[in-house]
Structures are given as C-alpha cells and as structure tokens.
UniProtKB/Swiss-Prot annotation:
Biological or metabolic pathway of the protein: Amino-acid biosynthesis; L-isoleucine biosynthesis; L-isoleucine from 2-oxobutanoate: step 3/4; Amino-acid biosynthesis; L-valine biosynthesis; L-valine from pyruvate: step 3/4
Catalysed conversion reaction: (2R)-2,3-dihydroxy-3-methylbutanoate = 3-methyl-2-oxobutanoate + H2O; (2R,3R)-2,3-dihydroxy-3-methylpentanoate = (S)-3-methyl-2-oxopentanoate + H2O
Annotated positions binding [2Fe-2S] cluster: C56, C129, C201
Record-given protein name: Dihydroxy-acid dehydratase 2
Annotated disulfide bonds: none
Cofactor: [2Fe-2S] cluster; Mg(2+)
Organism: Bradyrhizobium diazoefficiens (strain JCM 10833 / BCRC 13528 / IAM 13628 / NBRC 14792 / USDA 110)
One biological process term in Gene Ontology: isoleucine biosynthetic process
KW Lyase (keyword) present: yes
Assembly and interaction partners: Homodimer.
E.C. number: 4.2.1.9
Role, per record: Functions in the biosynthesis of branched-chain amino acids. Catalyzes the dehydration of (2R,3R)-2,3-dihydroxy-3-methylpentanoate (2,3-dihydroxy-3-methylvalerate) into 2-oxo-3-methylpentanoate (2-oxo-3-methylvalerate) and of (2R)-2,3-dihydroxy-3-methylbutanoate (2,3-dihydroxyisovalerate) into 2-oxo-3-methylbutanoate (2-oxoisovalerate), the penultimate precursor to L-isoleucine and L-valine, respectively.
Length: 574
C-alpha cells in the first residue's frame, strides 16, 4: 500500500473510489479520462462562483484552472464545479436585491451538497462578489474538510476626467443627476469609464471587506486577497493554493482548527481597522455559527470599539484596494495591528503557520499613507460602530469611517419599503434634519434584508449625506456613506420597535456612546405594540418564502439552520 493509498483510507472519497463495490463509480471516472492513479488520489473540489452577471466573478473560471494545476502538481485530483451567486451591483435598487442575502445560504448549501454528494476530500473555493465570499467560507467550516479560500480580486479604478472613480461614484451620480448637478451627457460618460476591468467593487465595500477577513481569519494565503482581478499574479496565488491544500490534507489541518474565537476577533479587528462594510457584522456571526461558536453582533461591536481605524480606504477615505495591495497589502495592515496588540498572533492559518509567523518578515513601508501605523491611527476607534437602545434592543450597526459628526437627533420620517423612500428622495419630498426610517426590509420582513445603496447614494449625490440620517432593519452596501444605521433589531416584521415608530417621533443617535433611542416611554411603546399586527407578504412560495420561514435575526448573522453546536457528525469524519 503506497502513501497516497494509505491517506485515501481516511478520506471521504474512499466511499466512491475504493473496493469492488465501487466499480460502477470508477467507470464514470474512466469515462472522463481519469487514470487509475488519479482515481486513487485525494479528490479536491474546486468550487467557483463564476457567472456572467457582472465583472465581479468573470475572472473566476480562469483562476480555477490555475488552482487545478496546483492540485494536480501536488498529487491530487481536482474536480471543478460552479455554484450560483447574486451580484449586488446588478440586484441593487429593485426587487432582485431580496435574493442577495439568501444567496449566501444557497451558496453554502449548494457547495455542501456537491461536496457531500461526490465525497470530495478537500475544497478550494473561489468567490468574487459580496455574499459569495462569506457563503464559501461558511461552506468550508461547515464541511470541515481541508480548505483554502481564494478571492477573485478587485476591479481596477476608473478614470473620469482625471479623477479616480468607482461604482460608488456611479450611484452617487444618479443623485447628482436628479437635482440637475450632472447632465445626461456627463452621466453617460462616467458610466462608460467607472468600471474598466474584471473584478469586484474596488473600494472597501463588502467584497473587499470579506476578502480582508479571509486573510485575517486564516483561510486565505497571505497577500492573495489584495491583488486585483486582472493581475496575472492571481494565477500564481491560485496555483499555490492548489498545492497548499494538498499539504493541509497531509497535515489534517481543517477549517475549524483555523476559525477559532481568536481568529474571529482578528477578522473583526481588520474590518474595523480598514473602515470595512457593516455587512461583516452579519457574516462573521454566520461563519462562527457554522463552527458552533457564539459570536454575535455585540461581540463584533466590542472588537470594533477597541480597534483603531488605520486604512484610508474608500468609501470613507481616499484609496482603493489596488492601492493598498501595491504598498504592502493586507499583511501590512495586519502587521501594524499585531505589533500594537490588536491581533492574536498565535492563530493557525492555511499556511500551516501562525499569523505571527506569517507576518514575521513583513516590513513597515514608510513611503505610503494608505495604511497608517496603529499607534498613529486616523481615529482611535474603528470605522464601524455597534449601537443599542430602546429602538434597537438586539443592536444595530453604522459605518463612521470618514464621518466628522457622530451624533444626530431628528424627527422620524417612516417608509415601509425602500422604493417609497427612494421616490421621496428623488422628488425631494423629505426635509433636512429628518431621520428617514425604512422598515419591513429585515431578513423575514423583506424578505431578504435588502441593501439601501440606491437611496443613500442618491442622498449623498444631492449633498444631503451629512444633513439627514437613515435607519433600517435592512442592510447597507459597503459603498454607503453618511449617517446610515442598519440591521436594527428586532425587525419590524416581528414587532420590533422600529415597526412601532410614527412620523415625527424624535430619534437620538449617538455613535460615540453606541446608542440608538427613540424619545418614547416604555409604556408608550408597549401601548403601540398592542395595536401592531403582522403584515402580509407577497412572497408566499419559492426560495424567498423558504428563507423567510427559516431565517433568524440579524444579531446572530441571519442564519437558517441550527449550526455547528448542534452537529452530531461532521462531514469530514464520515
């Protein structure tokens, strides 16, 4: 019995390749041109979220081929497959956005089912858009087979009349156009140049935030998450990932060895330090849930509170992901956090080494101002803040990176769906100083917890970003700027306080103290609750109906199954 066959005896793929009873299974493999040696090697699933919906995922199929070469070079048998993804930039601003967050669960579920059904021994997952990144990482820790995550890379910035632009500028251009500050011709010109290449949105929006998380949490190779999609070095990272996953099989290093409580805290720290997307406060608890670790919005917020904001990245700052990669990448950011005591250095990673060991050779780059030293930060607390109060007993989240005013008080202006709020913004029928409330957009109530970028970007484009506030039980895009509070829980659909608000109620927001309150007594809120009744939904069948029945609250990551804590047998141990 050779070494490879010996390893095979403890791997899931033995159930489809070994012994006389599996002769029918082997006949299928021979039909695809596999050799006897390849059949008896470890099977590595190479999963990508490739599609032609948008530039975010268009480069993934190319990169998957490099992964397969790496797996084969290291003595494994790669098995490529695709799963779905919903691209937020295309889904934004219409009913399609209801599909976005549910797609995270669909990605995790479909990868799990494919790996289980075909008895793969390991997984390399490639993802390129907002929900596909956490969805793929959730699948990895759920299955707990040796795994490496690969980000497809960010888009290059566009150039509009000498100015660097991103898709954020496009959404804000719509607001400018609505008030006559941008002509039809200018809008046409900028939309043709804003997105010049393959790759996900280029600033520290949700995709790049979760890419940063993938390195910090230990599931991605150092530097691999920073290189833009068009850069050929991405193929080298992919080749290496294919080789490295074979080492993880040999060493039996699994995702749950990597994704520990400390690793989750590291991930939250890099989100705060980079002024990342508020969506991380949904995705980190969901990843933790797959491991059986309780790590909710309040745990994330505690890390945010004590982590300095050091990376000057858009939307709150000046630079895009390409700029950070070219001055040292995510390891440069992590190194200054580690040196100043904001990261746990003893967490194991997919390299087989610890965070501290991976960062040992990283030298500080003094010839740049993209990443500030952690002892000389942009601000001493993170770029994302958790809130709690009588309007949000289960918490809420706000991105404060780049904001100067962290307190706001004003009368509520209530809307029961995003379309109505956007129409009011487009028609300028709101007033300066109001707090726009968009409710019944939570995980159950939407269903799907839509992002409100269309509305927030229009407000910013109208020059009102600092003159109003917006709160919702839905979500915000990582591209959102301004005083915008999301994930307010409990959501309106289950009778949360946000569903009891009336126009004119005074709302007090304090991102310094971390509070979100309405100036109403407990008695008044209780009285209004007696008159509240659940709203009917139009989604009475299909995937969105199933999602609404299963999904939990935002505070726990909006998850749809009991999680690792209730697991009796892990797939990797079959």
């Amino acid at each position: 019995m050779n070494a490879k066959t010996n390893i095979k005896q403890r791997l899931p793929s033995r159930h489809v390749t070994e012994g006389p009873a599996r002769a029918p299974h082997r006949s299928y493999f021979y039909a695809m041109g596999l050799t006897t040696e390849q059949i008896h090697q470890p099977f590595v699933g190479v999963a990508s979220c490739w599609n032609e919906a948008a530039p975010c995922n268009i480069a993934l199929m190319r990169q998957a081929q490099a992964v397969k070469k790496g797996v084969a070079h290291a003595g494994g048998t790669p098995r490529e497959f695709c799963t779905i993804t919903v691209t937020d930039g295309i889904a934004m601003g219409h009913d399609g956005m209801r599909s976005s967050l549910p797609s995270r669960e669909c990605i995790a579920d479909s990868v799990e089912l494919t790996v289980r059904g075909h008895a793969y021994d390991a997984l390399v997952g490639l993802a390129g858009c907002d929900k596909s990144l956490p969805g793929m990482m959730m699948a990895m820790v759920r299955l707990n087979v040796p795994s490496i995550f690969i980000y497809g890379g960010s888009i290059l910035p566009g150039n509009f009349r000498g100015q660097q632009v991103t898709v954020q500028d496009m959404f804000e251009a719509v607001g400018k156009h609505s008030v006559g500050a941008m002509s039809d011709e200018d809008l046409d010109e900028i939309e043709r140049v804003a997105c010049p290449s393959a790759g996900a949105c280029g600033a520290q929006f949700t995709a790049n935030t979760m890419a940063t998380v993938s390195e910090a949490i230990g599931l991605a190779l150092p530097y691999s998450a920073g290189a833009p999609a068009p850069y050929e070095i991405r193929d080298a990272f992919c080749m290496t990932a294919g080789e490295k996953v074979m080492e993880l099989i040999d060493q039996n290093i699994r995702p749950r060895d990597i994704v520990t409580r400390k690793a989750l805290e590291n991930a939250a720290a890099v989100v705060a330090a980079s002024g990342g997307s508020t969506n991380a406060a949904l995705h980190l608890p969901a990843i933790a849930h797959e491991c059986g670790i309780k790590f909710d919005l309040f745990d994330v917020a505690e890390i945010f509170k004590k982590t300095p904001y050091v990376a000057d990245l858009k939307p709150g700052g000046r630079y895009v992901a390409k700029d950070m990669f070219e001055v040292g990448g995510i390891p440069l950011l992590m190194k200054t956090l580690l040196d100043n005591g904001f990261l746990h250095g003893d967490c194991i990673t997919v390299t087989g080494r610890t965070i501290a060991e991976n960062l040992k050779s990283v030298k500080w780059n003094p010839h740049q101002d993209v990443v500030h030293p952690a002892d000389k930060p942009i601000t001493v607390t993170g770029g994302v803040v958790g809130l709690k109060g009588n309007l949000a007993p289960e918490g809420a989240i706000v991105k404060v990176a780049g904001m100067s005013n962290l307190r706001f008080t004003g009368p509520a202006r209530c809307f029961d769906r995003e379309e109505d709020a956007f129409e009011a913004v487009q028609n300028r029928t709101y007033r300066e100083g109001e707090v726009i409330v968009i409710r019944y957009e939570g995980p159950k109530g939407g269903p799907g917890m839509r992002e409100m970028l269309q509305t927030t970007a229009a407000l910013t484009g109208q020059g009102m970003g600092g003159k109003i506030a917006l709160i919702t039980d839905g979500r915000f895009s990582g591209a959102t700027r301004g005083f915008c509070i999301g994930h307010v829980g409990p959501e309106a659909a289950i009778g949360g306080p946000i569903g009891l608000l009336e126009d004119g109620d005074i709302i007090e927001i304090d991102a310094v103290a971390g509070t979100l309150n309405v100036k109403l007594s407990d008695q008044e809120l209780a009285q209004r609750k007696t008159k509240w009744s659940a709203r009917a939904t139009n989604h009475t069948t299909g995937a969105l109906w199933k999602y609404a029945q299963q999904v939990g609250p935002a505070v726990g990551g909006a998850v749809t199954h009991p999680g690792g804590a209730h697991e009796k047998q892990c797939y990797a141990d079959i």
